[in-house]
Curated annotation (Swiss-Prot):
Gene Ontology cellular component terms for the protein in this record: membrane; monolayer-surrounded lipid storage body
The encoding gene: OLE18
PTM (free text): The N-terminus is blocked.
Protein's UniProt name: Oleosin Zm-II
Biased amino acid composition, Basic and acidic residues: 33-42
Amino acid sequence: MADRDRSGIYGGAHATYGQQQQQGGGGRPMGEQVKKGMLHDKGPTASQALTVATLFPLGGLLLVLSGLALTASVVGLAVATPVFLIFSPVLVPAALLIGTAVMGFLTSGALGLGGLSSLTCLANTARQAFQRTPDYVEEARRRMAEAAAQAGHKTAQAGQAIQGRAQEAGTGGGAGAGAGGGGRASS
């Protein structure tokens, strides 16, 4: 212990190689560094895993639709361009070609952005739902404990009342009837 205190941050001349390895850095043993969060000792939470499992297929589907729209617009342009150039004047097919290309790229981008924004929205909703759940569970647990305590208190009061009546009936009831009966007869 004294050697470790004298060794300081860098291990010092008195510290052995093993002591330097245990200290790791900052003069703290490695176990404390792990506890402080320098190394992650647990994986993703259940809510994170559920969020990923739910949102990946949806986002993937929307991104696939985005890719299909892009592919369809490129193939459509490749097929329609020669037909427009052969059977129409030059300006009309050029305008249609540019319009189709712009619409295809805009559709592709819109579907991609829609997929990403829906993933973000669902992820935020899922996180908020899972963060609220423990509060509701804790509130229900507290109410159940209060109800159980109140029921126990009422049961104890009822038991004491019954016990008190039984004692009165056993001891005070016989003496009270004889004394009360004699008082009424003399009046």
